[in-house]
Amino acid sequence: MKNKIITFGEIMLRLSPENNERFTQCHEFEAVYGGGEANTAVSLANFGVDCGFVTKLPEHSIGQSAVNSLRQYGVDISGIVRGGDQIGIYFLEKKTSQRPTNVIYNR
């Protein structure tokens, strides 16, 4: 029997201004999916560890995009339940030498 690591948690959509801009300066955001447990599953998969992720995501195209982002790294997505209307979003203004990281959650 082969061992497998399963992570449980929320995957969120992260929106960040490009080019280290502030929220008040930007006109476009870079979109990336992540979250502590999802990031762990992706990291393990990158090291060749058999792993899966368990969560609930909406049936719409944003939910499917989150599923696809995990699948592309080789994470087993068979434990993902589909339903509901929303995915958590957070805005991340990246740290520079002059300012700290700024995070705003929208759940």
Label every PLM stretch briefly.
Residues 54-107:
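Conserved N-terminal subdomain of the carbohydrate kinase-like
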Residues 24-34:
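Short pre-catalytic strand/loop immediately N-terminal to key active-site residues, enriched for Gly-Thr
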Residues 20-23, 67-69:
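Short, glycine/charged-enriched secondary-structure capping and boundary segments
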Residues 1-22:
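Positively charged, low-complexity intrinsically disordered leader regions
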Residues 13-16, 35-42:
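N-terminal glycine-rich anion-binding loops that anchor highly charged ligand groups
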Residues 40-50:
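Alpha-helix C-terminal capping segments
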Residues 5, 30-32, 54, 59:
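Short glycine- and Lys/Arg-enriched binding-loop motifs that mark or flank ligand-binding interfaces
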Residues 34, 38, 64-67:
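Short, surface-exposed alpha-helical segments at coil->helix boundaries
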